[in-house]
Amino acid sequence: MMQDLRLILIIVGAIAILALLVHGFWTSRKERSSMFRDRPLKRMKSSRNDDGDDDIEDNDDEGVGEVRVHRVNTAPGVGHGEQEAPRQSAQHQYQPPYASAQPRPQAPQPVEEPVRQPQTQPVHQQPVAQPQPVQQHQPVQPVQQPQPEPQTVQTQPAPPVEPEPVVEEAPVVEKPQRKETVIIMNVAAHHGTQLNGELLLNSIQQAGFKFGDMNIFHRHLSPDGSGPALFSLANMVNPGTFDPEMTGDFLTPGITIFMQVPSYGDELQNFKLMLQSAQHIADEVGGMVLDDQRRMMTPQKLREYQDRIREVKEANA
């Protein structure tokens, strides 16, 4: 929009300047032609006046004035020829004035031709092509753009939005961390001795353990090795694993049996089964059952284990 308006203003300004130049040129030419037309008449009038003045001055200089008759006293006896002599002299004397008084031949006057007025031919307006922008010396005043009038937009009131029923989310109750514990007991050889590997492996298998994950033995719910693991058996020597291809040709100071609580099923019943398996292995290899501190197992320690199991069960109930 701004570019179109600016282009229109430039075209209108160029046409106006061109019209002013044409009008000024035509006016000056008309005035100049009228001056040349009046100048010969003035010259002729001035020449005529000058000729009249010259004639008057010549007549004055030559002494042409009023004709006066003077009486001439002639002597008696003078012949007729004597009287004609002065007349001739007088005629000869007055001849120059008459000759000078003759009108001078006037210069041929120039024939004045009627000055023809220049016929104004109708100007056929040619289709104006878009001219190149003319560099005007006058500063172009900035075109004030019409300020947009603020339009009052009538907004229709939005339909009332019915509040959606707020569904109160149930408070998330953080579950307390599950309490866990590990029950540990050991079967070890007597002081200064070690358990025989072959005898130990036979007693472990008789107690229902199966070799499995982590290269240790596990006691499953079923003696044939099916079902979840209830407790496990590891070597007392680090890293606590057994050789999968062991042939019984090894010695060890003992084994460790451990159960994680809570576990599958009844933890107290699983604890009794673990204690029976430890006593069976100890009887077979000639060892003894120790607690988690590798001390002799006592009834007080057994009750402590049972209390720990009950506490975990109640905490997780």
From Swiss-Prot:
The gene is zipA. One of its GO terms (cellular component) is cell division site. Interacts with FtsZ via their C-terminal domains. Residues 51-64 have a biased composition (Acidic residues). PANTHER family: CELL DIVISION PROTEIN ZIPA. Residues 1-6 are periplasmic. It is a single-pass type I membrane protein. It comes from the Bacteria. The keyword Cell inner membrane applies. Residues 90-156 have a biased composition (Low complexity). This is Cell division protein ZipA. Belongs to the ZipA family. Residues 37-174 are annotated as: Disordered. The chain crosses the membrane at residues 7-27. Its main location: membrane. Keywords: Cell cycle, Cell division, Cell inner membrane, Cell membrane, Membrane, Transmembrane, Transmembrane helix. GO terms for biological process: division septum assembly; FtsZ-dependent cytokinesis. Coiled coil: none annotated. Essential cell division protein that stabilizes the FtsZ protofilaments by cross-linking them and that serves as a cytoplasmic membrane anchor for the Z ring. Also required for the recruitment to the septal ring of downstream cell division proteins. The keyword Transcription regulation does not apply. It comes from Enterobacter sp. (strain 638). Residues 28-317 are cytoplasmic. It is found in: Cell inner membrane.
